[in-house]
């Protein structure tokens, strides 16, 4: 609260109300979510709307991300596109460094030096089929060299506050790349917020075919024809796109040192979840892929089955009396707008709100200054708080206004002793 409040007396208005979920009403008594048994070394399940962590297991263990690294590579590309510094139609020069032959036994777009390819196609080659060659081509296109691009990746991670992130390449093949599940879930949430179209345009696409005839070098075009040429069609590495309703991203990964990794997101009934699972161990690629999909599905189902998104009505609150100001009162508004809450199923019917706000304050009052709060509780336990702030600025009044209010305050204080 502001240090210039008149006296410690604070008005407390208790407003109890039912918060009905938009998708239905639940009458069953609230029960604790059942235990979740996952083999992954590190796990985080996050609600997208609120950033609330619903489940965690060793969330701060530092682990190699493998191809989850490519999400940072894509993020930097989208930033340049959105800033007008790059276009999806820009041609990309495929150097010897980006030749698919340099990355045997790994995920590839199957680029060859001299291919006629665009930024948009490269992005698909990274997001859909996890091309390590495509990641190098994009890094060189943006920064001139892989080393310069890696420096950009680490600078961006530092600027965003992700202290566990460390990158040494744009594709994730090295075990020296580092993340934690907690920070990567936060990054995935930010990625979707900043680049929401990437889900429909890239991450949820189930297959990608390359090279098309027009991508071939003139020398390769000379020995075939559009009718004869057959591109390589590959499926998205995220098998949950086929098997789990609502999944539309994000990225899979594997390196031997870490195991099988997954960053997955799904939306059902207005609720979007983000799951990060790192370090799933298996004896073979098929086994690891199957375990990764099974654990990802189990994590998402646990979240959707046990939690619900609630958008409660805001309770009533009153303007605050302003003394010695150009106006006699200031209106309140919720900081950040109406809240979204995530509750265990069964608790939404017991949701209540307590409004605590200042009775009066001495000018000046700054717009956005905290003057109260709403405390949400379910089943008698606090679940969230929301600040109430000044909706407008109230500067000090003129000399006679301040003098008159000072006299009135003195009179009030004299008779209230």
Placement of each model-derived feature along the sequence:
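Domain-terminus/edge residues, biased toward the C-terminal soluble/receptor-binding domains
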Residues: 162-163, 175-179, 183-417
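Periplasmic/cell-envelope proteins involved in peptidoglycan metabolism and beta-lactam response
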Residues: 2-5, 154-157, 415
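Active-site-adjacent loops and short helices of periplasmic peptidoglycan-processing enzymes
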Residues: 30-194
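Bacterial N-terminal signal peptides that target proteins for export
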Residues: 2-15
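Catalytic-site microenvironment of enzymes
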Residues: 15, 103, 218
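C-terminal segment of classical bacterial N-terminal signal peptides
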Residues: 19-29
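Helix N-cap / beta->alpha transition motif
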Residues: 3, 118, 341-344
């Amino acid at each position: 609260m502001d240090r210039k409040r008149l006296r410690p007396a604070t008005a407390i208005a208790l407003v109890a109300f039912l918060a009905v979920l938009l998708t239905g009403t639940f009458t069953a008594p609230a029960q604790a979510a059942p235990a979740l048994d996952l083999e992954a070394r590190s796990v985080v399940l996050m609600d997208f709307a609120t950033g609330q962590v619903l489940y965690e297991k060793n969330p701060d263990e530092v682990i190699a991300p493998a191809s989850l690294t490519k999400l940072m590579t894509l993020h930097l590309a989208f930033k340049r596109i959105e800033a007008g510094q790059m276009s999806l139609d820009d041609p990309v020069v495929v150097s010897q460094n980006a030749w698919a032959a340099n990355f045997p036994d790994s995920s590839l777009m199957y680029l060859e030096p001299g291919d006629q390819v665009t930024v948009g196609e490269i992005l698909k080659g990274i997001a859909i089929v996890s091309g390590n060659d495509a990641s190098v081509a994009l890094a060189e296109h943006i920064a001139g060299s892989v080393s310069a691009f890696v420096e950009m990746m680490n600078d961006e991670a530092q600027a965003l506050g992700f202290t566990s992130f460390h990158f040494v390449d744009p594709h994730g093949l090295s075990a020296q790349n580092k993340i934690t599940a907690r920070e990567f879930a936060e990054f995935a949430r930010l990625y979707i917020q900043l680049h929401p179209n990437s889900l429909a345009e890239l991450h949820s696409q189930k297959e990608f075919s390359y090279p098309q005839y027009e991508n071939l070098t003139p020398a390769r075009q000379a020995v075939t024809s559009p009718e004869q040429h057959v591109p390589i069609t590959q499926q998205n590495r995220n098998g949950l796109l086929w098997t789990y309703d609502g999944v539309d991203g994000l990225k899979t990964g594997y390196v031997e040192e870490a195991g099988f990794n997954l960053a997955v997101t799904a939306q059902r009934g207005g609720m979007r979840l983000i799951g990060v699972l790192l370090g799933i161990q298996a004896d073979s690629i098929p086994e690891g892929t199957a375990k990764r999909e099974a654990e990802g599905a189990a994590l998402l189902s646990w979240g959707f089955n046990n939690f619900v998104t609630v958008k409660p009505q805001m309770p009533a609150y009153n303007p605050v009396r302003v003394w010695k100001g150009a106006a006699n009162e200031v209106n309140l508004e919720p900081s950040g707008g109406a809240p979204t809450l995530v509750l265990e199923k069964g608790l939404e019917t017991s949701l209540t709100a307590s409004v605590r706000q200042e009775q009066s304050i001495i000018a000046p009052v700054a717009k956005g200054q905290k003057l109260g709060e709403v405390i949400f509780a379910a089943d008698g336990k606090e679940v969230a708080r929301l600040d109430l702030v000044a909706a407008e600025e109230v500067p000090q009044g003129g000399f006679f206004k301040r003098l008159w209010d000072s006299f009135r305050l003195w009179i009030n204080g004299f008779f209230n002793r």
